[in-house]
Regions:
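Conserved, mostly hydrophobic/aromatic
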Residues: 52, 261, 327
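Active-site-facing alpha/beta catalytic cores
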Residues: 66, 79-244, 265-270, 274-281, ...
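Generic N-terminal targeting/processing segments that precede catalytic cores or assembly contacts
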Residues: 28-46, 61-74, 82
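Short acidic, Gly/Ser-rich segments with clustered Asp/Glu that frequently serve as metal-coordination loops
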Residues: 54-57, 256, 264-270
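Conserved phosphate/anionic-ligand binding catalytic regions in large, soluble enzymes, centered on
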Residues: 48-61, 323
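Acidic (Asp/Glu)-rich catalytic clusters
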Residues: 40-43, 70-77, 125-130, 213, ...
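N- or domain-start disorder-to-order transition segments that initiate the globular core
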Residues: 1-43
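Internal helix-turn-beta structural module
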Residues: 304-342
Length: 342
């Protein structure tokens, strides 16, 4: 094999024992999990915002962002439940570039997976312990989920991973909502097949064990736009897109039909300020059609402290080093606008 086996990493149980969740933290997560579940099952008509930096690059600035987010979340909690987006793994189209805190706890340092495992657990723990906010992360590596399984309230499977069988089967064994994105080519049947697979029970290999999952009734779709073969970005958040997805769900017979609309990525063409208009467009569609209102459970928004983005070695505190994000002032205003229009 063309790889060096550098060192054996601790298993999730060992990391959890060294960095434990307190009973108080567990109770907060359990309560938030119940609230979020009630939205996906239709028992609650509150709205979900999965919101935060494109990538969680530095703990200090991410936690400052979450502190600000918590203050706003408390003011809109009658209409919105806010889930901070703390994405610590980054899929890369060609494999190059910053791969996230798991790989590089120091964005300008060398990869260090052991330090990375500890760093991402401590970051998610801080969000829960210090701000009472259980968080969302992307499940880029299914085998790594258990390092964070007692901290996360939401998981996303990305556009490049949604066709992968291990992602689908692992999603079927989680007890929290898992959003499965449409693939980069835009074929919604691929996404719906992934959602269907995640809803069903399976027997498979996970972390060296033969396991049986019970199926995840909270697995759902995420619309993020797509690219044509010639590289053109195409959005899929419009009224007719949401209505089409409603029809696909009706044909599928799946329990708890749901979608989260990703306002960035190909939906915005990575023009981060377009996220504001897209959010309002989705809310307008929801007001126009009760089926869309029931289907659309929330939005995914990329935002940070400072507008835009910078290179990985940039020194602007709280500005994204991956995709451009909304800055804090625009974010705060948008959250209040969303609450006013629900």
């Amino acid at each position: 094999m063309n790889m060096k086996f550098y060192r054996k990493l601790p298993i999730p149980q060992e990391v959890k024992a060294e960095y434990p969740v307190t009973p108080e933290m567990a109770a907060v997560k359990e309560a938030r999990d119940r609230e979020i579940r009630s939205i996906f099952t239709g028992e609650s008509n509150r709205f979900i915002l999965v919101i935060g930096p494109c990538s969680a690059d530095k703990s200090e600035s991410v936690l400052e962002y979450i502190g600000r987010l918590k203050r706003v979340a408390d003011q809109v909690q009658d209409k919105i439940i806010v889930i901070p987006r703390i994405y610590t793994n980054k899929p890369r189209t060609t494999g190059d570039g910053y791969k996230g805190m798991l790989h590089q706890p120091d964005p300008n340092g060398h990869p260090d997976m052991l330090r990375g495992i500890v760093a991402i657990r401590q970051l998610h723990m801080s969000a829960l312990r210090d701000y009472g906010m259980s968080s969302a992360d992307e499940m880029l590596y299914p085998d790594n989920h258990r390092y964070l399984s007692d901290l996360l309230s939401y998981v996303a499977v990305g556009a490049r991973s949604v066709e992968n069988q291990q992602h689908r089967l692992t999603a079927s064994g989680l007890d929290i909502p898992v959003g499965l994105k449409n693939p980069t080519g835009g074929d919604l049947s691929v996404m719906m097949n992934a959602v269907t697979a995640a809803h069903h029970p399976h027997t498979f290999i996970y972390r060296g064990w033969e396991v049986e999952s019970t199926g995840n009734p909270l697995a759902h779709a995420i619309l993020r736009g797509y690219q044509t073969t010639d590289g053109k970005t195409v959005s899929n958040y419009h009224y007719e897109d949401l209505l089409h997805l409603h029809e696909l769900y009706a044909k599928s017979g799946l329990e708890n039909p749901a979608v989260i609309v990703d306002t960035n990525h190909a939906n915005s063409g990575k023009k981060y300020e377009e996220q504001i208009r897209i959010a309002h467009d989705v809310l307008h569609s929801m007001r126009q059609n009760p089926d869309i209102r029931r289907l659309c459970k929330g939005l995914m928004i990329e935002s940070y402290l400072i507008d835009g983005n910078q290179k990985t070695d940039g020194d602007v505190y709280g500005q994204s080093i991956t995709d451009p994000c909304l800055g804090w002032e625009k974010t705060e205003r948008l959250i209040f606008e969303i609450a006013d229009r629900l």
